[in-house]
Amino acid sequence: MDPRKIQLPREIYTGPGVIEDTGRICRDLRFEGRAMVVTGPRTLQIAGEAAIESLQAEGFEVDQVTVDDATMASVRNVQDGLDGVSVVLGVGGGKVIDVAKMSATLEGLHFISVPTAASHDGIASPRASIRNGEGTASLEASSPIGVIADTEIISRAPFRLLASGCADIISNYTAIMDWKLAHRLLNERYSESAAALSLMTAKMIIKSADAIKEGLEESARLAVKSLISSGIAISIAGSSRPASGSEHKFSHALDMIAPKPALHGEQCGVGTIMMMHLHGGDWQFIRDALARINAPTTAAELGIDPEYIIEALTMAHNIRRERYTILGDRGLTREAAERLAKITEVI
């Protein structure tokens, strides 16, 4: 087997108030000089200003840029300001983190992830979801050298974001089943350790589902730890296989066709219900777990017309065709897709 490099975060800080240690953490990681802080329009005030103040208190010169969307145009905009910068910090939600991560990767710089919400597993993964003209592409990037997850800030984010992140973790169930299937049928490289870590995080979320409540710092801490663990599983595997299978293909298809897609994790959760049925597994178990964390389980709860659910199911196999899943090479007919969505009570 060819040698592979596994990139993992060197420092992970979670807990209330850790945003105030941003400057010291960067010093401990041997950074100096200029730092770039990437934020969203809202997250600058929520956490960006605190991170900047902490950096300046440690003697850093700080540049700041605001991004509105996760596009290559946003990535290039950040890149334009990275001359002389020693470290890039992404302070915000998934889009901000992905843009900061991708721009740092392209410039060969280290990146620190500072999430303000626990909405998906990109917090610590070596992947970035960047939108292009044909939808959203999952691009290879460098893992963050550090993660600073202030659970007090994250607990104040809309609960829908945290529930979406938990649903994204629960979707690891079918991602692992798809990966095992590809290993058996196509001899695709499979990592027992990455799969075990990914599945463990999903089981941990489901086991603790009744304790995941709005506004609780403990709930934010649990979700963040699970999302970070899932991201590390991706790093170990060298691909997003441990956390992305047929359910993610379904979500990406919805992103392409639905007039107003739901959150990424929400769509993946609903996709997991249906893909678990295709695998012959306990789809009701998945549905009930999602319901316990107040994540959507139906098209109506996603706010998406049933017609788009059916269409997304029929086209999902064409997303990343090199990634074999339970959908196979030919996918589902319209009749099979409609039947699947009705049997699982998604529509």
From Swiss-Prot:
It is found in: Cytoplasm. Gene3D superfamilies: 3.40.50.1970, Dehydroquinate synthase-like - alpha domain (1.20.1090.10). It catalyses: sn-glycerol 1-phosphate + NAD(+) = dihydroxyacetone phosphate + NADH + H(+); sn-glycerol 1-phosphate + NADP(+) = dihydroxyacetone phosphate + NADPH + H(+). GO terms for molecular function: glycerol-1-phosphate dehydrogenase (NAD+) activity; glycerol-1-phosphate dehydrogenase (NADP+) activity; metal ion binding. Optimum pH is 6.6-7-4. Activity decreases gradually at pH over 7.4 or below 6.6. Keywords: Cytoplasm, Lipid biosynthesis, Lipid metabolism, Metal-binding, NAD, NADP, Oxidoreductase, Phospholipid biosynthesis, Phospholipid metabolism, Zinc. Binds 1 zinc ion per subunit. Substrate binds at residues 121, 168, 252. SUPFAM superfamilies: Dehydroquinate synthase-like. Catalyzes the NAD(P)H-dependent reduction of dihydroxyacetonephosphate (DHAP or glycerone phosphate) to glycerol 1-phosphate (G1P). The G1P thus generated is used as the glycerophosphate backbone of phospholipids in the cellular membranes of Archaea. Is also able to catalyze the reverse reaction, i.e. the NAD(P)(+)-dependent oxidation of G1P but not of G3P. Is not active toward glycerol, dihydroxyacetone, glyceraldehyde-3-phosphate, glyceraldehyde and glycerol-2-phosphate. This is Glycerol-1-phosphate dehydrogenase [NAD(P)+]. The gene is egsA.
